[in-house]
Amino acid sequence: MVPQGWSLAWVSVLYVSVIPSLHIINNENSVFIGTHSETELRHWLIFVKMAQRSGTAWWRMASVPINAYFERDIAFLFNPRCVIETALGSKILCRYNKNIGVVFVDNDTTCNVSFPSGVQLQLLNQSVMESIRTKTYVVDYARKTTERGDCFISVAFCRKERRRFLPRYERFVYYCISVYLFAVAVFCSCWFALDPLFNMWA
C-alpha cells in the first residue's frame, strides 16, 4: 500500500522540476516582448532582467507610450523614484534598480534627467544594446550623459521586426505538453489517493 502523502509529494516534484522548465524554454525564445508603433515614436521600452546563466543576461521588454499614465500601466514593475523630463516638457516618474533599465525612444535627442539623492542608475551596457540590435530591434542610438556623469539615456530610432513571440506551432506544442503533464499528475494523484480504498475493498 502506498502512503497517502506520497502522491502529493510526487505531484509537487513534477511541478517544481518540469513545469518551470517549460517556462524557461519559453522565456529564452521570447525574451523580448513588446510593441512599437510606426506612427507613435515616443515610447518607453522597459527591459526587465529575467535570468542570467553562463554569463548571458536575458531581458524581458515592455513598451509604453510616453503619453500614457505611467504608474497605471506598469505599476506592477515600478514605484516612482526619479523624474525624467523630455524636451517637450513631459515629466515621467520611474524607478530604477539593478534589474531594470530604461531606454527612451524618440526622434529628439535632448532630454533632462533629475534624481533624488541616493538614486543610482543601472546602465544599459553595450552588450545589451547589441543584443537588442541583433535579436529584436534595428537600433541606431546615441547617448546623452547628465552633467554629473552618473547615467545616460539611450535615444534610439527603432524598427520593430516581426519576430515577437514563439511560432504558433511551438506554443501549441508547449500547451499540449503542459496539459498532458497536468493530466498525468491528476491521474496519478487520484490513483495513489484511492489505492488504500481499493486495498480495503479487496
Swiss-Prot record:
**Annotated TM spans:** 5-25, 172-192
Location of this chain's protein in the cell = Host membrane
Indicate the segments annotated as coiled coil, or none if absent.
none
Protein's membrane topology = Multi-pass membrane protein
Key word Iron present? no
> Carries keyword Membrane?
yes
Q: Which GO terms describe its cellular component?
A: host cell membrane; membrane
According to UniProt, the name of this protein is Protein U22
The species this protein was found in: Human herpesvirus 6B (strain Z29) (HHV-6 variant B)
Q: What is the lineage of its organism?
A: Viruses, Duplodnaviria, Heunggongvirae, Peploviricota, Herviviricetes
